[in-house]
């Protein structure tokens, strides 16, 4: 079976929030191909949105800087739910620090869908 498999509540209480440090070096080859992929999508008329899904962790501000910078340079939207208090304040939404459980996935899907609707169909269109 492939695709999403729901995970019920956390198997055990989650520890405190984990701290992730940003990488000191970005892989320039990977970044080049992400940029090429974005450019190809834009040439075809696609709406490109970068998304960082929720994790039960704390990150420093530089963690997503390369992605945020690329989004800014290309005029794209970057939806960063990783450090979003809606999720980091709710350990009951997580199966483990990197995976939402079914309750968290449902809540994230509601929020993400609403945000995506605003991007794809701005008011007045």
Q: What is each residue range found by the language model?
A:
Residues 1-44:
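Secreted/periplasmic serine-hydrolase-like ester/acetyl group-modifying domain
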Residues 5-7, 47, 58-59, 111, ...:
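Weak global preference for isoleucine
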Residues 7-9, 14, 60, 90, ...:
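Serine/threonine-rich low-complexity intrinsically disordered regions
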Residues 21-23, 51-53, 97:
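A short, structure-level motif marking secondary-structure boundaries and short turns
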Residues 24-30, 54-63:
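Acidic-and-aromatic substrate-binding clefts and catalytic sites of carbohydrate-active enzymes
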Residues 35-59:
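Active-site segments of SGNH/GDSL-like serine hydrolases
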Residues 36, 63-66:
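A short acidic, amphipathic alpha-helical/loop segment
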Residues 65-125:
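C-terminal regions of proteins
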């Amino acid at each position: 079976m492939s695709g999403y498999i729901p995970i019920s509540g956390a198997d055990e209480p989650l520890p405190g929030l984990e701290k992730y440090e940003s990488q000191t070096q970005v892989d320039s080859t990977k970044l080049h191909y992400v940029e090429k992929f974005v450019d190809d999508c834009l040439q075809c008329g696609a709406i490109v949105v970068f998304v960082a899904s929720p994790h039960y962790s704390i990150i420093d501000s530089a963690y997503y800087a390369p992605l945020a910078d690329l989004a800014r340079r290309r005029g794209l939207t970057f939806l960063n739910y990783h450090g979003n208090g809606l999720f980091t304040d709710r350990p009951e939404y997580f199966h483990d620090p990197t995976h939402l459980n079914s309750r968290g996935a449902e809540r994230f899907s509601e929020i993400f869908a609403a945000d995506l609707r605003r991007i794809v169909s701005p008011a007045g269109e």
